[in-house]
């Protein structure tokens, strides 16, 4: 296990950690459907990326009809 040579003060420790925070990415608007999506990702609403359909989305299945 590593052992420190000298004590690291709270100020020096916190200054080192100042740049460790995570920043949320700004969502972009889908050019096909207008929904918000993550940058450089396929739109979850319509399955398009770069104005091309990449994923064909299936229709939702109604479970209420099957349960009866």
Swiss-Prot record:
Q: Which GO terms describe its cellular component?
A: large ribosomal subunit
- Please indicate which superkingdom the organism of origin belongs to: Bacteria
A biological-process GO annotation: translation
Gene Ontology terms for molecular function: structural constituent of ribosome
Q: Name one Pfam family in it.
A: Ribosomal_L32p
Keywords assigned by UniProt? Ribonucleoprotein, Ribosomal protein
Keyword Ribonucleoprotein assigned to the entry: answer is yes
Concerning InterPro entries, the annotation shows: Ribosomal_bL32, Ribosomal_bL32_bact, Ribosomal_zn-bd
Residue ranges of the region described as Disordered: 1-21
Stored PANTHER family:
50S RIBOSOMAL PROTEIN L32, LARGE RIBOSOMAL SUBUNIT PROTEIN BL32
Which NCBIfam families does the annotation name?
Answer: rpmF_bact
**Similarity comment:** Belongs to the bacterial ribosomal protein bL32 family.
Name of the molecule in the record: Large ribosomal subunit protein bL32
What species was this sequence derived from? Roseobacter denitrificans (strain ATCC 33942 / OCh 114) (Erythrobacter sp. (strain OCh 114))
Lineage of this protein's species? Bacteria, Pseudomonadati, Pseudomonadota, Alphaproteobacteria, Rhodobacterales
């Amino acid at each position: 296990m590593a052992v420190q040579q000298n004590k690291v003060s709270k100020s020096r420790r916190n200054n080192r950690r100042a740049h460790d925070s995570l920043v949320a990415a700004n969502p972009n608007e889908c050019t096909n459907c207008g929904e918000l999506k993550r940058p450089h990702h396929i739109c979850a609403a319509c399955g398009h990326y770069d104005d091309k359909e990449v994923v064909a989305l299936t229709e939702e299945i109604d479970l209420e009809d099957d349960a009866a």
